């Protein structure tokens, strides 16, 4: 598993207009070629009256699966420029379809490249990008009297508290890079004078916004 990678924040759409033509970018997270192709077909069915539904996707830790489709636009003017935007932003496991409704003015090859790549770029700005970091989920159990201390420490150290449970005792689940767990445990033990129990809940990806 990768220690970290970038992908889209969420599925979404964004529209731009160029010389009367509408370009609607649709984004979806995907983990297989089947998922990507299914997503593309879904968009094509929804926008069956559109002039074109061009698409691109990247899948896998090393981008093992990647495809670009022009859907009737001149070869190399749509799918490949769209794919290049995904690569430039270092994204993984993403599919994008750009739906075009022709507005009456031809854009030429260069204009099409700029339009399709621009639709993807503007769409990414609108829906956002996140960095997924592989982190250890560490549960801390302690007395209610220490809630403020732990919250303040985590806040000042930029350590996310991803879950809080209040029962007989308090249990916070914190998300940390694996290499920082030991130092964090030592700091909490010192802070709470050893009045704390730890349990590792395993590793999972935590998402951080990319500005």
Where are these predicted regions, by residue range?
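C-terminal regulatory domains involved in ligand/effector binding and gene-expression control
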Residues: 1-76, 199-211
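Active-site beta-strand/loop microenvironment that shapes enzyme catalytic pockets
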Residues: 78-126
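Short amphipathic alpha-helices in soluble, non-transmembrane regions
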Residues: 150-155, 183-192
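Conserved short beta-strand edge segments in small beta-sheet-based binding/regulatory domains
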Residues: 161-165, 192-209
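Terminal, non-globular segments
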Residues: 174-183
